[in-house]
Regions:
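Intrinsically disordered, low-complexity sequence elements enriched in Ser/Thr/Gly/Pro
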Residues: 1-2, 67, 101, 116
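N-terminal glycine/threonine-rich, aromatic-flanked beta-hairpin/loop signature
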Residues: 43-81
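Conserved glycine-centered beta-strand/turn positions repeated across beta-sheet architectures
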Residues: 35, 61, 100-104
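Beta-sheet ligand-binding and adhesion/scaffold domains
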Residues: 22-26, 41-50, 79-120
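Amphipathic/hydrophobic helical signal segments and adjacent flexible N-terminal regions
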Residues: 1-32, 36, 40-42, 119-120
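Generic low-polarity alpha-helical segments
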Residues: 13, 72-73, 99-102
């Protein structure tokens, strides 16, 4: 009995961290990204950032320090990517209980990553 209980607890602890992560959503059109986003950009430090994405995938982002970048989201072989005035890389969109999260990861690790939540 103790063995079964220990096994059950081990399985629950192993699976429970996965429940907190939302699965990536397959983006079929960059129009799905249109709107205002707020989050964090990380290069050497982490700072607040805002981004506005147009229906054609073009975007403008700025940080609280005043750094700005413009870019374009696009689909390549069914995968969401971006190219900006600073870097290029992959992007992913997830939806967890109605909260849309957009993650951007530069191909070159020197340029860091960003994570935004849709605000409108």
């Amino acid at each position: 009995m103790k063995r079964k209980l220990a096994l059950l607890l081990a399985v629950l602890f192993a699976v429970s961290p996965l429940a907190g992560f939302a699965a990536d959503k397959q983006v079929k059109d960059v129009k799905e990204l249109a709107g205002s986003w707020q989050g964090w950009a990380t290069e050497q430090t982490q700072e607040r950032a805002n981004m506005v994405v147009q229906a054609d995938g073009k975007y403008k982002a700025s940080t609280t320090r005043g750094l700005t970048t413009e870019g374009q989201f696009y689909l390549q072989d069914g995968k969401l990517r971006y190219r900006s005035s600073r870097s290029e890389g992959t992007a992913s969109l997830s939806d967890d209980k109605g909260k849309a999260t957009l993650r951007m990861t530069a191909d070159n690790p020197d340029y860091g990553k960003a994570e935004y939540e849709r605000i409108r």
